[in-house]
Amino acid sequence: MLLAIDCGNTNTVFALWDGARFAATWRMATDHRRTADEYFVWLKALMDLGGHAPRVTGAVISSTVPRVVFNLRVLCSRHFGCRPLVVG
């Protein structure tokens, strides 16, 4: 599955794309102090609750908040084993 991350000034939205539809979406407040590990613990808990094992094979990050991009990149590489495409 593709992990799509849309980071705006107010909220960051995470979504799982299965190739045909969004299998799940989650939203959290954007905070530049949040670490990659915090993102992962939160996201994995929601994935587990929804029955979505963390089988992410790719990721894309769209962001208007440059200070957050580094930790989102680390989230993708460290916890999902993929190098994200960053746009925006």
Give the label of every model feature segment.
Residues 1-2, 51:
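Short, low-complexity, intrinsically disordered N-terminal peptides in bacterial proteins
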Residues 50-88:
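Short beta-strand-loop/turn "lid" adjacent to the catalytic site in phosphate-handling enzymes
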Residues 2-45:
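Short glycine-rich, Thr/Ser-proximal phosphate-binding strand/loop in the N-terminal lobe
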